[in-house]
C-alpha cells in the first residue's frame, strides 16, 4: 500500500499532507522500484531536446519580462501549428543579478511568466530550454526564428552563443539495486 499525494508547487496544494507524511517515523525508503527502461527510452525518443544560451543587446531599454513571455508565446504558437506537444519549455533572462522566467509546461496550458524580473534592460543573457515531441532539428530552426522575431521587434540584436538540439539516448543507470534475498 503506497500513499499517493497530489502536490502543487504552484498553488501549495498537498504540502501539509506531505509534511505530515515526512514527519512519520518508521522503516521507510526500502522499496526498490522496478523501472522498465525500454518504456522510458521509448518516451524519451519521442522528444526533441534543445538547450541554448544567447546574448541580446539593444540601444534602448526594453521590458525583460515582456520579451521572455513573447518568446514563449511565439514558440507555443508554432508548436500548436505543428501539433507538437510541449513537455517543457522555459526561457530565462539574466541581467546584473536579476532574472525572470517564462514557461509552458503543457500544450494544453497558456504560456506564463512564472518569475518576473521587473527589469528594463539593454543587454541580457537568455537561456532557452525545451523538451518537445518533435524533430530536434526542426525545434532548433523554430527557436532561432522566433527568438530573432521577438528580439527584432524590440530593436535589439541577438547572438546565439551555444545551441544543442538532439534526441536523448537510452538511459543507462550507473547504479542499480539487485533484488537479492
What is the role of each PLM region?
Residues 1-44:
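Canonical P-loop GTPase G-domain recognition
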Residues 27, 31-181:
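P-loop NTP-binding site
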